[in-house]
Each structure stands twice: as C-alpha cells, then as structure tokens.
Amino acid sequence: MKTYIVGGAVRDRLLGLPVRDRDWVVTGETPESMRRRGFRPVGRDFPVFLHPDTHEEYALARTERKTARGYHGFSFHAAPDVTLEADLARRDLTINAMAEDENGELVDPFNGRQDLAAGILRHVGEAFVEDPVRILRIARFAARFGFSIAEDTQNLMRFMVDDGEVDHLVPERVWQELSKGLMEAQPSRFFTVLRDCGALARILPEVDALWGVPQRADYHPEVDTGVHAMLVLDQSARDGLGLAARFAALCHDLGKALTPAELLPRHSGHEGRGEAPTRALCERLRVPAECRDLALLTVSFHSHIHRIRELRPDTVLRLLRECDALRRPARFDDLLAVCRCDAHGRPGHEQDAYPQIAIARRYLDAAQSVNAGDIARQTPDKSTIPYRIDAARLCAIEAAKRQIS
C-alpha cells in the first residue's frame, strides 16, 4: 500500500502556509483491501475512505472521463493499476497537482512547484475544459494568492464560456465557490477574473452590469460603478467583515445598473431599483437567508445611513423599525459596517471619518432605552400600546438628536 499527500496540503506547505486539511491518495489497492485494513468507506461517487485512527480522507487513485455537461457529468475509474501520475493528471491546476510520498519526497510531474514560485495559475491538461467549476476555482485562487493566470489557461476559460459549459453549473456549487471567493484576502480578484473570461455575465449578470455605468466624479473619483463595487468589497475584507456583510457590499449598488440613461451620472432612486436584481440573484443561487436579508437591507437603506445626521426623528424611527434594529442589533451593526466600507471604497477617501455609525448607534440606544413593558402595563386601552411605545421612542430619538446637533 503506497500513500501520498496530495493537492492543497502540498501547495500550502511549499508556500509556508498552515496546512489545515490533508488529503491522501492510495495506489495499488481496491475497496475490498482498504476495508480489510480497517478503512471506512465514505465516498458516494468514487472510493474514498476514512483512516481508522486519524479519520483523514484516503482516496484510491482514479481517472475520470467526461460523460455530460456540467459539474456532475463525469464517470470515474479506480483500480490498482491507476498510477499516482494518472491521478494527478486529472487535477485542475499544476500547483494542485503535486504530491509527497511517505518519505516527504515531492512528486511534481507538471512543474507545479515552478508555477508556485512564479505565482502562476496554469491548467494541467486539456481535460480542464470538462469541468466548469474550475473557472470558479481559478478565480478563487487568484483572490487568495494574488497569482496571475497563464495565457493558455485564460484562453481555455474563454472557450468554456463561449461553449456554454458554465451555463450548466448548478446553483449550489456556484454559491459554494462564490461564498469562498468573498472570504478571500482580495475578493475583487474573484470577480475580475470571471469578468475577464466572460463568465461573470453568465453567472452573475446583475454584478457584471455595473461596469461601464458612470457615477458623479465629485462623489466617486473612480467613476465606474463596477470599480466602486470592487473597492467596497475589498474594503470589507480589510475590515474583517463576515460573509453576509461582504455579500451585502457586493450587492449594495446593483440598482445603479438600472438607472435610466437620462439621469446619469446621478442615481436618484437606485436603492429602490436595486431590490429586484438582488432578490433575483439570491433566488437563483439559493443564497442563505442571513446573507440575502442583510443584502436587501443594505440595498434599501445604505443612503439613509450615509445621511443619518440629516434625517428627521420620525424617519430615523422608521429606519430602525424597518431594519428590525431593536430586535436584531448585531445585524444592524453589520449594515453600518458595510455602509462605512461604501464610504471608504473611493480613491482618496479610505481614511475618512465616518461618524454616521456612532450617530446611528446613539439613536438605537435611545430607542432601546424606552421600557416597552412598563408602557404596556400602564396603558388601560391596550389597542394604543404600539402608538404609545412609538411616541416614547420618538421622544427619545428627538432628545438624542438635540444632543448630537
């Protein structure tokens, strides 16, 4: 029985990064012999086993053959005569097609170490075109490592898009890769890589439509709305925001792509126009409710937060109510954090003060200071309880506004 550490564990060790998960490939064995050795089968589509002691995954060396379009359109062949090199040849990128034997010797038939040192993402072979998920993975690795993409690989990605292969990606897998891409160090690279090969227009047309839409240069020195969206997204990564907040940053200005041409470069009403494309994107990709809801709140109310010092107390109360801020203060904090990224996502404004967060929290604290239970107990006519609670909260917000002013 010969075992090899493969893929990301080898790559990350060579990069000097922490190795979190180790995947193993086994040659010269069968499913029956693996079970006799105490390995527990867990693979549904191909032979994968858990080690009896470490519980790490061990997969029999295998080859694969394309049988239909899309991510699931493959058949696999695993047998004792499948070599390690044959198994590595089916992998996506040279930097992921390396292995180490039990003595720590590197097995590198496709010069992955050389590409790793040069910072290049390069496909292993022509079979790359058979799996559209690989386009998303390349975009994700570009966002993680900042690597460039080999010209031949870029050409293959464009071919896959033109051939319609990406149109067969299942929503769950797109979201899986998108959510990982959003959490990388430079998430904008994920989207620009997809845009450069034409995949963004097929997978996320609502986002792709932002490029080429102008904004007022006095507010947005970057002018282009797509560029602004990427600046905001990268700011959310620098600020260490979570997945829901980063997704909200991506979606916050989707309505600007729908601004009538005669209004440009102004975008009055873009908040309302942004709801439909955001909902469409979320429904199509089956985005989790936490991410969807924060994105919709950000789309609808980011301009309110930017102008919160100017808002009337009754408008502030309505904002807090529609954001469900009294019951969901942590989510409201996420909204505020995304709005700060929006303000900072403009060249020359990265370090600007953003007092709106402190003001919004002051208003929320004022509204929360009202004891709704006491009001309810002291109100004989129970039908007026909501009105009296709102009136008390409005008075508290008015007092806070006077102090802020």
Swiss-Prot record:
Describe how the cofactor binds: Magnesium is required for nucleotidyltransferase activity.
- Which reaction is the catalytic activity of this chain? a tRNA precursor + 2 CTP + ATP = a tRNA with a 3' CCA end + 3 diphosphate; a tRNA with a 3' CCA end + 2 CTP + ATP = a tRNA with a 3' CCACCA end + 3 diphosphate
Note from the entry: A single active site specifically recognizes both ATP and CTP and is responsible for their addition.
Name the coenzymes or cofactors required.
Mg(2+); Ni(2+)
Give the quaternary structure. Answer: Monomer. Can also form homodimers and oligomers.
Please give the organism: Laribacter hongkongensis (strain HLHK9)
Q: Which GO terms describe its biological process?
A: RNA repair; tRNA 3'-terminal CCA addition
Concerning Pfam families, the annotation shows: PolyA_pol, PolyA_pol_RNAbd
Q: Which residues of this UniProt protein bind CTP? A: G8, R11, R91, R137, R140
**Which family would the database say this protein is a member of?**
Belongs to the tRNA nucleotidyltransferase/poly(A) polymerase family. Bacterial CCA-adding enzyme type 1 subfamily.
Q: What is this protein called?
A: Multifunctional CCA protein
